[in-house]
Amino acid sequence: MTAVNVALIRDTKWLTLEVCREFQRGTCSRADADCKFAHPPRVCHVENGRVVACFDSLKGRCTRENCKYLHPPPHLKTQLEINGRNNLIQQKTAAAMFAQQMQLMLQNAQMSSLGSFPMTPSIPANPPMAFNPYIPHPGMGLVPAELVPNTPVLIPGNPPLAMPGAVGPKLMRSDKLEVCREFQRGNCTRGENDCRYAHPTDASMIEASDNTVTICMDYIKGRCSREKCKYFHPPAHLQARLKAAHHQMNHSAASAMALQPGTLQLIPKRSALEKPNGATPVFNPTVFHCQQALTNLQLPQPAFIPAGPILCMAPASNIVPMMHGATPTTVSAATTPATSVPFAAPTTGNQLKF
């Protein structure tokens, strides 16, 4: 995680005191130590009816002879100290909020950069490079979806995402037990002290919604004194199971509290791309930067010969058109008969199909 340190800037607003207007007129009957407003001397700088107190004076270390800041009396000094503590709390709160916002911005930037890889290889501008056999097919690097583990991936710094359709293991509740269905039918061969399910003697204990009974926690602690308790009193082997389940729940809660929020979050597996022709679904992993590097690599190219039948035209002049991507070549007058030239046309027409 990136730590963001914000320097605390000294703010002089909390050091500002209002000047007594009666003192400015020379009619204030209260002394400096009694008036709730400031009585600054002439050397102090007063602006808009306010004066700034001397910070060094609050610490008891001002050595200036004619200080332009106010040296407040004890009662105003106490007020300024309270203002200073409140201002420090506000600055720390603002710094913490700023650091949290910066952390969220960094996390969003990291997540947005994951989806910025090109999805298709770039085709070079050179025509022969368009038929480059070294350009990887867009389907290269695709992994079948069944080879990807179904377990979620843990990565740092991402906001937690919901996992639709993910069902975790069913945890045993520490205050309820499932009733034995065989016992309800009257054909349970296991005894009350051997069956892993509850054998309640009173049918009113059973909750019809989930077929469970509520455990009497006082009985487990050995202090149930009710004659007809409406809760189930489990045998010893079921008590051991309940205590183990309770311990497991406490351990899981402690482990969850140990993780910092935002450190490890679950993200779902990337959804597969369904093929319309019924082929195996695939997904695109983050290998496109390697694919892009191979695409931009300039390699020597072999001559391109298109597949299928080739249609040739008889030359009408001394310019013979060559294959795609090559430059036209000027040839001299033919010294051999036209029938020996591979591109010559027969007498029946000017087209020849190989």
Curated annotation (Swiss-Prot):
GO terms for biological process: mRNA processing; negative regulation of myoblast differentiation; regulation of RNA splicing; RNA splicing. Its main location: nucleus. Keywords: Cytoplasm, Developmental protein, Metal-binding, mRNA processing, mRNA splicing, Nucleus, Repeat, Zinc, Zinc-finger. GO terms for cellular component: cytoplasm; cytosol; nucleoplasm. It comes from the Eukaryota. A zinc finger (C3H1-type) spans 14-42, 48-74, 174-202, 210-236. GO terms for molecular function: RNA binding; zinc ion binding. The keyword Transport does not apply. It is found in: Nucleus; Cytoplasm. Highly expressed in the placenta. Mediates pre-mRNA alternative splicing regulation. Acts either as activator or repressor of splicing on specific pre-mRNA targets. Inhibits cardiac troponin-T (TNNT2) pre-mRNA exon inclusion but induces insulin receptor (IR) pre-mRNA exon inclusion in muscle. Antagonizes the alternative splicing activity pattern of CELF proteins. May play a role in myotonic dystrophy pathophysiology (DM). Could inhibit terminal muscle differentiation, acting at approximately the time of myogenin induction. This is Muscleblind-like protein 3. It comes from Homo sapiens.
